[in-house]
Amino acid sequence: MTHCNNQLIDQLLTQAEQEGRCLIPPSTAIRKALLRRTGGTVVSPMPGLFARKTRWDELNRAQRHCEIIRALAIIHPDWTFCSFSAACLLGLEASWRHLNVVHVCSSTKPSARPGSHIQRHQIEPAGAIRRAGISVTPPIQTVTDCLLQTGFADGMPIADSAILKLGLAREQLMEAVEQRAT
């Protein structure tokens, strides 16, 4: 790899870091060069996405998840993120074990193939909002979706943080869950 490619890759990685996202290679040549670096100075948290290993190692699971989502939102601007991914973008306390895949709304049937990095939920993103330019399900829908998909131990931190950080009323949240559960 040439010195120019090394400099370009470092510049691209720095730019992605400043934007709080993973690097999306602008060309096949850069992608191949990044793949050669994986296992060393670069990690690939998802096919086609890259990050500098030293920085990636400093991030917690929620921060990593958000960096992946920000990159995917550039690649797929029409996607609406939902469930635990939307909760993460909204700054809610989601259990890290629910952040192993990216949760996306889909008008087709839900999917979660083994080993897949994307889980599609058959959820209509009615009233989707934009958070830092990224389409996410509305807060009340996001929290309700999470609560209906998880148990009490994982649901409580999401509900508490929604009340504290988003100003949702406890009664409003309980009513939304009851409506969706029936």
PLM feature spans:
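Short gly/ser-rich loop at a beta-strand->alpha-helix junction or flexible surface loop bordering the NTP-binding
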Residues: 1-182
